[in-house]
UniProtKB/Swiss-Prot annotation:
This is Non-structural protein 1. Residues 180-215 are annotated as: CPSF4-binding. Transmembrane segments: none annotated. It comes from Influenza A virus (strain A/Turkey/Bethlehem-Glilit/1492-B/1982 H1N1). Inhibits post-transcriptional processing of cellular pre-mRNA, by binding and inhibiting two cellular proteins that are required for the 3'-end processing of cellular pre-mRNAs: the 30 kDa cleavage and polyadenylation specificity factor/CPSF4 and the poly(A)-binding protein 2/PABPN1. In turn, unprocessed 3' end pre-mRNAs accumulate in the host nucleus and are no longer exported to the cytoplasm. Cellular protein synthesis is thereby shut off very early after virus infection.
Length: 230
């Protein structure tokens, strides 16, 4: 196993512990708590994959961070902060919406680019809106925390979420996953609309009907399905 992979995991565990302490002392906001819960799941997945104990990894991470801080000067810290752009956090969903349990009558799942796409194929003839919580860097979607599809009455019918045990994802991975979700829901005559934030930061456009364009691969797939029906 690569030593850098282990070191990275250990440091991530310790930094998560520090963030958890802040949350317990009510020193953070809702998006912070949101990321904390998601990152906890991701760390558990990585720990299982690497075969490492989270408690031991946290203690080792503490030693690594303390060694670094001993040699770190205030001037170096100022330079690092000035040269690193800070991502923004975009929230379409409330804490209740992003944490609510939901169930599928006819489940369908697909993995693409480190993301899990889930949808209920029993949903038909509904007006559906896509909402997402994600970070933005350089005015473009950087990391997806969660995307969910809601009916007009608030029921959750589909979801896209990162797979904790897999590496990160790109903006293109997110767009492809959204294309798969849209294609699957539209096949059952549902009408799909994405939030303005998803349109702006994932595609850099805003469509009047709120429907993001399907990726080329997804367009060809849908065309073949239509032809087979005809």
């Amino acid at each position: 196993m690569d030593s850098n992979t282990i070191t990275s995991f250990q440091v991530d565990c310790y930094l998560w512990h520090i963030r958890k302490l802040l949350s317990m002392r009510d020193m953070c906001d809702a998006p912070f708590d949101d990321r904390l819960r998601r990152d906890q799941k991701a760390l558990k997945g990585r720990g299982s994959t690497l075969g490492l104990d989270l408690r031991v990894a946290t203690m080792e991470g503490k030693k690594i961070v303390e060694d670094i801080l001993k040699s770190e000067t205030d001037e170096n810290l100022k330079i690092a902060i000035a040269s690193s752009p800070a991502p923004r956090y975009i929230t379409d969903m409330s804490i209740e919406e992003i944490s609510r349990e939901w169930y599928m009558l006819m489940p369908r799942q697909k993995i693409t680019g480190g993301l899990m796409v889930k949808m209920d194929q029993a949903i038909m003839d509904k007006r559906i809106i896509l909402k997402a919580n994600f970070s933005v860097l350089f005015d473009q979607l950087e990391t997806l925390v969660s995307l969910r599809a809601f009916t007009e009455d608030g029921a959750i019918v589909a979801e896209i979420s990162p797979i904790p045990s897999m590496p990160g994802h790109s903006t293109e991975d997110v767009k492809n996953a959204i294309g798969i979700l849209i294609g699957g829901l539209e096949w059952n005559d549902n009408s799909i609309r994405a939030s303005e934030n998803i349109q702006r930061f994932a595609w850099g456009i805003r469509d009047e009907n709120g429907r993001p364009p399907l990726p080329p691969k997804q367009k060809r797939y849908m065309a073949r399905r239509v032809e087979s029906e005809v």
